[in-house]
Design a protein with these regions (language model features):
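Basic, Lys/Arg-enriched C-terminal extension of HTH/homeodomain DNA-binding domains
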Residues: 189-220
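The short loop immediately C-terminal to the conserved phospho-acceptor aspartate in CheY-like receiver
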Residues: 51, 57-61
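Short, flexible helix-to-coil linker/hinge segments that flank and couple to helix-turn-helix
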Residues: 93-103, 109-151
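Acidic, metal-coordinating helix/loop segments flanking the phosphotransfer/catalytic sites
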Residues: 34-52
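Active-site residues of response regulator receiver
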Residues: 10, 56, 84
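Helix-turn-helix DNA-binding segment
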Residues: 137-190
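The feature encodes the CheY-like receiver
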Residues: 15, 60, 88, 199
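Acidic catalytic/metal-coordinating carboxylates
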Residues: 37-40, 62-66
């Protein structure tokens, strides 16, 4: 079994240690380095090339968003998990650009469930884009409040599927969560994406582009 090599960066030593302990409950996860600021995180990432970098947004010397940019500019295959206390959509937009995959933006409060960090890392490694549920709720509320007439309204079923897509769940997991067969979930996901103006030209996994579209609509 190949080890998943992870970098953890947070200026709070307690949080660094806590994340490491949670991650290493998984036999195939290995925290290969821990950094206490953004600049050190970039230096370590460029040397060790981790599979995933978990970065606090607010760090001294360099914030997590800039650290993520520098890491992925050099090694785009490295997955990024940004952890933040802020649900500011401008922060989210800064990391979720141009249909970016293998990226997550998660709020610290969500990590009270220790399994959530593991789920998010696994989703990022699988190539998905992941947003915190609170961010998803905020985006969907803004989307529904958008009065532009060309925007088709989502049905309740489409919205339920889209929310879980944006949270980084794949279609089999969405089907299990909603208690539906996979085929109706696939149809609902497709129709929701079409209402956002996404087509097959955006790829088989349109979730990253759905994230980008909603951010474009909701972030001034």
């Amino acid at each position: 079994m190949n080890q998943l090599r992870i970098l953890v960066a947070d200026d709070n030593q307690f949080m660094r240690t806590a994340y490491k302990r949670i991650l290493e409950t998984q036999d195939d996860f290995e925290v290969v380095c821990m950094a206490e600021d953004g600049a050190e995180a970039v230096e370590m990432a460029l040397e060790l090339v981790p599979d995933v970098a978990i970065l606090d947004v607010m760090m001294p010397k360099m914030d997590g968003i800039e650290a993520a940019r520098q890491i992925t500019d050099r090694y785009p295959q490295t997955g990024i998990v940004l952890i933040s206390a802020f649900d500011d959509l401008a922060f989210v937009s800064a990391i979720m650009k141009d249909g970016a995959t293998r990226r997550a933006y998660i709020l610290k409060n969500s990590l009270d469930d220790i399994g959530e960090l593991i789920r998010v890392v696994e989703a990022v490694v699988d190539g998905r884009a992941v947003l915190d549920p609170r961010i998803v709720q905020k985006l969907m509320a803004l989307y529904k409040g958008n009065s532009r007439p060309e925007l088709a309204s989502l049905t309740e079923s489409e919205e339920n599927v889209l929310k879980l897509m944006l949270e980084g769940y794949d279609e089999p997991a969405i089907a299990r969560s909603l208690g539906l067969p996979r085929e109706p979930v696939e149809a609902l996901a497709s129709s929701a994406c079409e209402k956002l103006g996404l087509t097959e030209q955006n790829g088989t996994d349109r979730t990253p582009w759905a994230v980008q579209t909603l951010l474009n609509l909701c972030v001034a």
